[in-house]
């Protein structure tokens, strides 16, 4: 049995808890204090769009018995990692061309490292959070926590049978808080659960576990319900500017920080419901789950970035960018964003792809993921329409005789290909004739 994971409350020891202020972590913190642990509460400010007062959360933790409560501002680091993911195309999950932008994995990478770093400052070497044993987060936090503090031990109340026996459900936790003098009112149960940060929101579980229930039951927190006929969405033009792979302007406006740029990108994209998607994905443990996602700012920046990538880079570079992006997206999803194999892929894309991406892209946003690209401008473009113009041009880069020569050279590999197909036919791997897929390859 692992010595890293504690299955019973460590009495008399400091225990750090990732504290959200919700029912679960509030009850857990009070319970740990009453049972003899010394709880320290750490709250990550990730720019959650559904959080109204971050400063109230540490105060609440102190009321529930925290020895110390700290609010850790993680927004700058989250914005930095979000831009890195866009630069690398680190997104491996998509359906019908609509992308999930790995916003929860990005949030976990930042939370897992920054909260554990804060705990080290307070000499807290035991960490607990609210992730369950069936999900991805339990492994992501485990990896990031131990990367940051190799002496870290893990205690999760939700893996402690005593906690589960005493406070196994939301009703029991609510009654526990009320019995201890806290006027806690359970929030109205939604048909799904929501987790969010500045980059995006995840809606999953409960009714959304059933595939006959979909986006129409979701109330967006970062944008509009674009699928509803009573929601008015007006078309809007927006221009996104990049310098050396970094988004720097929206409609010509510069921003004091990447955080402010993301917030404005969220507002613009959110007015249209841009970046919402419904995905079936494979969790780390290879079981499938379903989520409905929002990421209006990430989607806006990603579309503009990829337009510039295709205008600037050659085909082989774009191919490597896409292949490596799929691999890197999966590593990010698995909680390996800071592993050597991920850093290698990140460095490749950020150095050799992103650094050349300078320019502006103008889009018209409509409803949901419906948009058009109106203009693309870059000093680094290798797109030159005169090279392939259907009109007669002066000083053309090549003429018909050049193309005849190029096509003649193709005879070499065409002949080789025909010979190989003949070998496959002779061995029975292929058949030729009227009803075959290669009816014209018989010897004539």
From Swiss-Prot:
<feature type="binding site">
    <location>
        <position position="100"/>
    </location>
    <ligand>
        <name>L-citrulline</name>
    </ligand>
</feature>
<keyword id="KW-0067">ATP-binding</keyword>
<keyword id="KW-0547">Nucleotide-binding</keyword>
<feature type="binding site">
    <location>
        <position position="137"/>
    </location>
    <ligand>
        <name>ATP</name>
    </ligand>
</feature>
<dbReference type="InterPro" id="IPR048267">
    <property type="entry name" value="Arginosuc_syn_N"/>
</dbReference>
<dbReference type="InterPro" id="IPR024073">
    <property type="entry name" value="AS_multimer_C_tail"/>
</dbReference>
<dbReference type="GO" id="GO:0000053">
    <property type="term" value="P:argininosuccinate metabolic process"/>
</dbReference>
<dbReference type="InterPro" id="IPR001518">
    <property type="entry name" value="Arginosuc_synth"/>
</dbReference>
<protein>
    <recommendedName>
        <fullName>Argininosuccinate synthase</fullName>
        <ecNumber>6.3.4.5</ecNumber>
    </recommendedName>
</protein>
<feature type="binding site">
    <location>
        <position position="130"/>
    </location>
    <ligand>
        <name>ATP</name>
    </ligand>
</feature>
<feature type="binding site">
    <location>
        <position position="204"/>
    </location>
    <ligand>
        <name>L-citrulline</name>
    </ligand>
</feature>
<dbReference type="InterPro" id="IPR024074">
    <property type="entry name" value="AS_cat/multimer_dom_body"/>
</dbReference>
<feature type="binding site">
    <location>
        <position position="44"/>
    </location>
    <ligand>
        <name>ATP</name>
    </ligand>
</feature>
<dbReference type="InterPro" id="IPR048268">
    <property type="entry name" value="Arginosuc_syn_C"/>
</dbReference>
<dbReference type="GO" id="GO:0006526">
    <property type="term" value="P:L-arginine biosynthetic process"/>
</dbReference>
<dbReference type="Pfam" id="PF20979">
    <property type="entry name" value="Arginosuc_syn_C"/>
</dbReference>
<comment type="pathway">
    <text>Amino-acid biosynthesis; L-arginine biosynthesis; L-arginine from L-ornithine and carbamoyl phosphate: step 2/3.</text>
</comment>
<feature type="binding site">
    <location>
        <position position="281"/>
    </location>
    <ligand>
        <name>L-citrulline</name>
    </ligand>
</feature>
<keyword id="KW-0436">Ligase</keyword>
<dbReference type="GO" id="GO:0005737">
    <property type="term" value="C:cytoplasm"/>
</dbReference>
<dbReference type="GO" id="GO:0005524">
    <property type="term" value="F:ATP binding"/>
</dbReference>
<comment type="subunit">
    <text>Homotetramer.</text>
</comment>
<dbReference type="GO" id="GO:0004055">
    <property type="term" value="F:argininosuccinate synthase activity"/>
</dbReference>
<feature type="binding site">
    <location>
        <position position="136"/>
    </location>
    <ligand>
        <name>L-citrulline</name>
    </ligand>
</feature>
<dbReference type="InterPro" id="IPR014729">
    <property type="entry name" value="Rossmann-like_a/b/a_fold"/>
</dbReference>
<dbReference type="GO" id="GO:0042803">
    <property type="term" value="F:protein homodimerization activity"/>
</dbReference>
<feature type="binding site">
    <location>
        <position position="132"/>
    </location>
    <ligand>
        <name>L-aspartate</name>
    </ligand>
</feature>
<dbReference type="InterPro" id="IPR018223">
    <property type="entry name" value="Arginosuc_synth_CS"/>
</dbReference>
<keyword id="KW-0055">Arginine biosynthesis</keyword>
<dbReference type="InterPro" id="IPR023434">
    <property type="entry name" value="Arginosuc_synth_type_1_subfam"/>
</dbReference>
<feature type="binding site">
    <location>
        <begin position="18"/>
        <end position="26"/>
    </location>
    <ligand>
        <name>ATP</name>
    </ligand>
</feature>
<feature type="binding site">
    <location>
        <position position="193"/>
    </location>
    <ligand>
        <name>L-citrulline</name>
    </ligand>
</feature>
<keyword id="KW-0963">Cytoplasm</keyword>
<feature type="binding site">
    <location>
        <position position="202"/>
    </location>
    <ligand>
        <name>L-citrulline</name>
    </ligand>
</feature>
<dbReference type="GO" id="GO:0000050">
    <property type="term" value="P:urea cycle"/>
</dbReference>
<feature type="binding site">
    <location>
        <position position="132"/>
    </location>
    <ligand>
        <name>ATP</name>
    </ligand>
</feature>
<feature type="binding site">
    <location>
        <position position="140"/>
    </location>
    <ligand>
        <name>L-citrulline</name>
    </ligand>
</feature>
<feature type="binding site">
    <location>
        <position position="195"/>
    </location>
    <ligand>
        <name>ATP</name>
    </ligand>
</feature>
<feature type="binding site">
    <location>
        <position position="136"/>
    </location>
    <ligand>
        <name>L-aspartate</name>
    </ligand>
</feature>
<comment type="similarity">
    <text>Belongs to the argininosuccinate synthase family. Type 2 subfamily.</text>
</comment>
<dbReference type="InterPro" id="IPR023437">
    <property type="entry name" value="Arg_succ_synth_type2_subfam"/>
</dbReference>
<feature type="binding site">
    <location>
        <position position="137"/>
    </location>
    <ligand>
        <name>L-aspartate</name>
    </ligand>
</feature>
């Amino acid at each position: 049995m692992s010595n890293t994971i504690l299955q019973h409350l460590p009495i008399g020891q400091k225990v750090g808890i990732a504290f959200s202020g919700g029912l679960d972590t509030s009850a857990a913190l009070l319970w740990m204090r009453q049972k003899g642990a010394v709880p320290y509460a750490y709250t990550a400010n990730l720019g959650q769009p559904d959080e109204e007062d971050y400063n109230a959360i540490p105060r609440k933790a102190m009321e529930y018995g925290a020895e110390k409560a700290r609010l850790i501002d993680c927004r700058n680091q989250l914005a930095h990692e979000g831009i890195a993911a866009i630069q690398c195309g680190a997104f491996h999950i998509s359906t019908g061309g609509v992308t999930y932008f790995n916003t929860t994995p990005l949030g976990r990478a930042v939370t897992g490292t920054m909260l554990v770093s804060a705990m080290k400052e307070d000499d807290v070497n035991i960490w607990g959070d609210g992730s369950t044993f069936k999900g991805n987060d339990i492994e992501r936090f485990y990896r990031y926590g131990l990367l940051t503090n190799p002496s870290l031990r893990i205690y999760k109340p939700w893996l402690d049978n005593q906690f589960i026996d005493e406070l196994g459900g939301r009703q029991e936790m609510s009654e526990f808080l009320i019995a201890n003098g806290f006027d806690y009112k359970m929030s109205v149960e939604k048909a799904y659960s929501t987790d969010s940060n500045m980059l995006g929101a995840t809606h999953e579980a409960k009714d959304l576990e059933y595939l006959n229930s979909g986006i129409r039951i979701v109330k967006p927190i970062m944008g509009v319900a674009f699928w509803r006929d009573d929601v008015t969405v007006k078309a809007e033009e927006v221009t996104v500017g990049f310098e050396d792979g970094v988004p720097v302007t929206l409609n010509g406006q510069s921003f004091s920080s990447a955080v402010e740029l993301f917030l404005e990108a969220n507002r613009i994209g959110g007015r249209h419901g841009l970046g919402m998607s419904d995905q079936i994905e494979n969790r780390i443990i290879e079981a499938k789950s379903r989520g409905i996602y929002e990421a209006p700012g990430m989607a806006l920046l990603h579309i503009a970035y990829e337009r510039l990538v295709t205008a600037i880079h050659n085909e082989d570079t774009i191919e490597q960018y896409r292949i490596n992006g799929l691999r890197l997206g999966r590593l990010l999803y698995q909680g390996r964003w800071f592993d050597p194999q991920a850093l290698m892929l990140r460095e490749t894309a950020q150095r050799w792809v992103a650094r050349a991406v300078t320019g502006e892209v103008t889009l018209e946003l409509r409803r949901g993921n419906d948009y058009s690209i109106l203009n693309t401008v870059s000093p680094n473009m290798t797109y030159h329409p005169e090279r392939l113009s259907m009109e007669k041009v002066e000083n053309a880069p090549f003429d018909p005789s050049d193309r005849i020569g190029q096509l003649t050279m193709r005879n070499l590999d065409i002949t080789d290909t025909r010979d190989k197909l003949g070998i496959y036919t002779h061995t029975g791997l292929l058949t030729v004739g009227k009803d075959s897929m290669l009816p014209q390859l018989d010897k004539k």
